[in-house]
C-alpha cells in the first residue's frame, strides 16, 4: 500500500508543480504569448498593455493585476517566474537576479517562423501545456492564406508611415499571403509620392489602429495614389496583428485572405 502511494505521488508531482507555478509578464509580446499558452490560473500578473484591446489579440486581461516593470512593484512576485525582455530592462533584470528571482527571457530573438515555433514550444513545456502549443503550432503550419495573385509586389503602410520589412513579422506576413516586398525598397528617409508611383506596387496593405497620424500614411489620400489602387488589391488590418512576431501575424494573414475573397 505504501509503495502504491509513493508511485502515485511520483506520477502526480510534475502536474502539481506545473499547476502551482505562476507567471508574471512584463511586456506586450510576453503578455500575448502567455495569454495564449498558459492557463488562467497560471497567470499572476501582466503588464498594463494586457488590458488594451488595440494591442492584444483575442485574449484580454480582465481580472489579473497589472504591473509596471519596476523593482518595487515586483517585490511581492519574487516567487513567480518573470517573463521579461532583457534588452528593454537590463538593470531591472540584473537587480532581480541579485534577489534570486526566476527570469524567463522573452527577447526579440526569433527571426523565422521555425524559431518562433521553438519559443512557443519552450513556453508550452515551461507551463506544462505542451499538448495545447503543439496543436497551436500545427494549426499555424497548416494555415493556407496564399492569395494566388499573379502580380505580388506589395507596399505596406502603417499609421506610423512606411513599414521597413527588416522586422520578421512583415516578411512572414508577406510569405503567408504569397506576396513579395517592393523590388525598389522604400524607407522613411526616401519615401515620397513620386517614389511610390515609380515603385509601381501591385498590392497595398494598410496597417492601422486609427489612433495615430503620419504624413506618409496621409499620402494615401492623394488622388494619384487613390487612382493607382482603384483596381488593385487593397487590404486593411488592425496594427495589433503585427505589434509582435507571434501567432498574431498568422491571424492578420487570415484576415487579409478573407478580405480577398470578397473583393
What are these regions (language model features)?
Residues 49-52, 60-61, 163-189:
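Alpha-helical, coiled-coil/dimerization segments enriched in small aliphatic residues
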Residues 10-19:
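Hydrophobic h-region of N-terminal signal peptides that target proteins for export
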Residues 22-87:
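A short, structured surface patch at a secondary-structure boundary
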Residues 26, 114-125, 134, 147, ...:
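Structured C-terminal subdomain patch of bacterial secreted/periplasmic proteins
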Residues 84-86, 105-112, 155-165, 238:
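Short beta-strand->loop
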Residues 2-10:
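Sec-dependent signal peptide recognition
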Residues 70-79, 98-99, 192-200:
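Short helices/loops that flank or line small-molecule/ion binding pockets
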Residues 21-37, 129-178:
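Basic- and aromatic-lined ligand-binding clefts that recognize polyanionic substrates
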Amino acid at each position: 500500500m505504501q509503495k502504491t502511494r509513493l508511485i502515485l505521488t511520483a506520477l502526480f508531482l510534475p502536474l502539481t508543480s506545473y499547476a502551482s507555478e505562476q507567471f508574471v509578464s512584463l511586456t506586450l509580446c510576453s503578455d500575448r504569448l502567455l495569454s495564449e499558452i498558459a492557463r488562467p490560473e497560471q497567470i499572476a500578473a501582466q503588464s498594463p498593455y494586457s488590458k488594451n484591446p488595440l494591442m492584444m489579440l483575442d485574449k484580454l486581461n480582465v481580472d489579473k493585476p497589472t504591473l509596471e516593470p519596476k523593482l518595487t512593484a515586483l517585490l511581492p512576485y519574487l516567487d513567480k517566474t518573470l517573463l521579461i525582455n532583457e534588452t528593454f530592462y537590463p538593470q531591472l533584470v540584473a537587480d532581480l537576479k541579485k534577489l534570486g528571482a526566476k527570469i524567463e527571457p522573452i527577447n526579440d530573438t526569433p527571426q523565422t517562423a521555425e524559431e518562433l515555433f521553438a519559443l512557443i514550444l519552450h513556453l508550452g513545456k515551461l507551463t506544462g501545456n505542451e499538448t495545447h502549443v503543439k496543436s497551436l503550432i500545427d494549426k499555424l503550419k497548416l494555415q493556407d492564406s496564399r492569395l494566388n495573385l499573379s502580380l505580388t509586389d506589395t507596399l505596406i503602410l502603417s499609421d506610423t508611415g512606411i513599414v521597413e520589412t527588416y522586422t520578421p513579422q512583415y516578411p512572414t506576413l508577406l510569405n503567408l499571403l504569397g506576396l513579395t516586398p517592393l523590388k525598389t525598397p522604400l524607407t522613411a528617409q526616401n519615401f515620397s509620392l513620386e517614389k511610390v508611383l515609380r515603385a509601381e506596387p501591385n498590392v497595398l496593405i494598410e496597417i492601422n489602429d486609427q489612433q495615430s497620424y503620419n504624413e506618409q500614411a496621409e499620402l494615401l489620400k492623394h488622388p494619384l495614389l487613390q487612382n493607382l489602387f482603384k483596381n488593385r488589391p487593397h487590404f486593411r488590418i488592425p496594427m495589433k496583428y503585427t505589434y509582435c512576431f507571434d501567432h498574431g501575424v498568422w491571424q492578420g494573414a487570415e484576415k487579409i485572405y478573407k478580405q480577398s475573397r470578397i473583393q
